[in-house]
UniProtKB/Swiss-Prot annotation:
Record bears the keyword Glycosyltransferase: yes
Family assignment from sequence similarity: Belongs to the purine/pyrimidine phosphoribosyltransferase family.
Molecular function, one GO term: adenine phosphoribosyltransferase activity
Its biological purpose: Catalyzes a salvage reaction resulting in the formation of AMP, that is energically less costly than de novo synthesis.
Pathway: Purine metabolism; AMP biosynthesis via salvage pathway; AMP from adenine: step 1/1
Protein name, entry field: Adenine phosphoribosyltransferase
PANTHER family linked: ADENINE PHOSPHORIBOSYLTRANSFERASE
PROSITE patterns xref list: PUR_PYR_PR_TRANSFER
């Protein structure tokens, strides 16, 4: 299946000069959505995953069906003020300033094997902060999976030596 057929390209969104890759058509097509999730599940099967972690919001959309198929839990990564219990946080640099991500401080148990799933790998800030959060709790990041990588933004450099899978490159 050619997954790129299910990605809408929107010029100048959310601001002038940006090309937005919209996964909504993929999510709206049951076969394409299932195919994408299954590809990530196949990547993760032999990694003995204990937990799937996904940054909001589109990491939830892909991560939850993957966790379900693997028979493991899902832990959300959210922006500050969105989680009701004690959290840990990681701050990362963006083009114009910084951003912070949080997780419940008991989301990951020491030694748990974690797969991080998100829709998009762009500059790598979100994935780097998510890896930091998992490792602060003693989790072991055994893989990262993305629907899309924007190659020119070089986000893979922030992943370093972590194993990862990408379904589509732009």
């Amino acid at each position: 299946m050619e997954l790129k057929d299910y990605i809408a390209t929107i010029e100048n969104y959310p601001k002038e000069g940006v090309v937005f890759r919209d996964i909504s058509p993929l999510m709206a097509d049951g076969n394409a959505y299932n195919y994408a999730a299954t590809e990530i599940v196949q990547y993760a099967r032999d990694k003995e995953i204990d937990m799937v972690v996904g940054p909001e919001a589109r990491g939830f959309i892909i991560g939850c069906p993957v966790a379900f198929a693997l028979g493991v839990g899902f832990a959300p990564v959210r922006k500050p003020g969105k989680l009701p219990r004690e959290v840990i946080e990681a701050t990362y640099e963006k083009e114009y300033g910084t951003d912070t991500l949080t997780m419940h401080s008991d989301s990951i148990k020491p030694g748990q094997r974690v797969l991080i799933v998100d829709d998009l790998l762009a500059t790598g800030g979100t994935i780097a902060a998510t890896i930091e959060l998992v490792e602060k709790m003693g989790g072991i990041v055994v893989g990262c999976a993305f629907l899309i990588e924007l190659d020119e933004l070089k986000g893979r450099e922030k992943i370093g030596d972590y194993d990862y899978k990408v379904l589509m490159h732009y």
